[in-house]
Amino acid sequence: SIMVILAGVAIFLILKGLPAITANWETNHDLAGYQNKNWGSFWNYVAPLLWGSLWSSLIALVLGAPVAIGIALFISHYAPRKLAGPLAYVVDLLAAVPSIVFGLWGVIVMRPFLTPLAQFLNEYLGWIPLFRGPVSSTGSTMLAGGVVLAVMILPIITALTREIFLQTPRLNEEAALALGATRWEMIRLAVFPYARSGMISAILLGLGRALGETMAIALIISPSILFSFAVLTDGYNSQTIAGNIANNFPIATDMQRSALIGTGLMLFVVSLAVNMLARGIIGRSTNRTRKAPKIGKRA
């Protein structure tokens, strides 16, 4: 079953990562000065990597979640049936695109495209810490990585949110319209309150997808293992756990591989917690949907 597989993965990560987690990083030959820095302990090493994963995922959610919810709302309540079906299919099809393709698209298209925007943001909004320079001339920024991640999580958030919107009882919608509400007022007063928990769970599942992304981020940004809020600079971007593993695992010694697997364990725990929270919210939303009265089918 799924629980057996998860338990097996967790046991593997714990057994392989425990030597580096419990090791003395100041005296161990392979860990002292690993990646050109004296970390002192495993936790000092994993903290900036975990921050990089969370920071890039947060940027993706801020950029992608509103767009995904807007697309879902358009498909479910505004688009004609002849347009809604093909549009939903195209959005769902994005989920089948490999990560490496998104990464190449980010390198070839998005990095040059976003460079003028980065210069504009730095020139006029540089007083905000997020947009401080120096601006990258190559486009290898966290902004570019966040945009690509936003596109990658778009299908899952859109699909789940669309289904939640479509499950809104018609009785609620028709009651709002009967009271004289416009279509937008009906959506705001009847659909959004009903779908709130479902939208939150969809966003959390998108977060889980973004946390584990590897190749796209590894190709696009020029990262370092540090705490940074910068989104426009080159070389001062926080490295992600997945990207760090992909870049360093092939050349690592046994103890260094243990350290990398240990960081993977931390990512596994965070991703599992996020997905369990999302599933719990979805389960609560599903139970409420079953209890709600339904009248007819949606036109």
Regions found by a protein language model. Give the residues of each.
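Transmembrane alpha-helices
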Residues: 93, 97, 157-164, 168, ...
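C-terminal transmembrane helix and the adjacent membrane-cytosol boundary/short C-terminal tail
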Residues: 162-166, 170, 246-299
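Interhelical loop and adjacent transmembrane-helix boundary motif
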Residues: 134, 217-268
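Transmembrane-helix boundary motif in ABC transporter permease subunits
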Residues: 60-91, 278-287
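Membrane-interfacial helix termini and adjacent extracytoplasmic/periplasmic loops
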Residues: 22-47, 102-151, 221-222, 232-235
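N-terminal signal-anchor/first transmembrane alpha helix
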Residues: 1-11
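Hydrophobic alpha-helical transmembrane segments of multipass integral membrane proteins
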Residues: 47, 51, 55-63, 67, ...
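Periplasmic/extracellular loop-to-transmembrane helix junction in inner-membrane transport proteins
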Residues: 13-62, 80, 135, 247-258, ...
